[in-house]
Amino acid sequence: MLNINIENEYSRLKTVILGIADNLGNPPSESDAFDPRSLYHIKNNSYPLEEDLKKEVESFKKKLTKHNVEVLRPNNVNDCNQIFARDLGFVVSNMFFLSNIVPNRQDEIEGIKEILNHLNVGVIKLPEFMHIEGGDIIVHNDKVFIGTYSEEDYPSLITARTNNESIDYLKRIITVSYTHLRAHET
């Protein structure tokens, strides 16, 4: 069983789930792009090649293991981009929260199920209407910073991935203080 406990983002890392770059499938079409940066690279024929991504991820793995970090890897899901494992869930204290990620990325969850089954705690699955991604969470001792988007057009934006309902839910479960981060208005 895996013991988990995250009190902040900068203490010594002991174990991490690192994404993989195997069997990504074809680059997405413009209409399937998840975010503006991917769309830019698709339009400019500069979308990363699988072989380059594999080298990058493996180089990162070597650095982690050199520093005695246990590296866990998702099981391969064919034709699925599994690079950004951080988005799939997050840990606060000794609780693992499984993200409700955008529908286009649901297959990625399959790749980490075996790892989740080996955790020494239950996995908390957020209710379906609550959206949150692990990359939007920063744990800082007795505080949790959550990046979110709360404008009325939230449902129409694929890049707005954490909503206010998820923040309210986390406030009820985790006994730490929260800081709601908003984009700077220019």
Residue ranges of predicted features:
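The feature marks the mature, well-folded catalytic cores of soluble enzymes
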Residues: 1-182
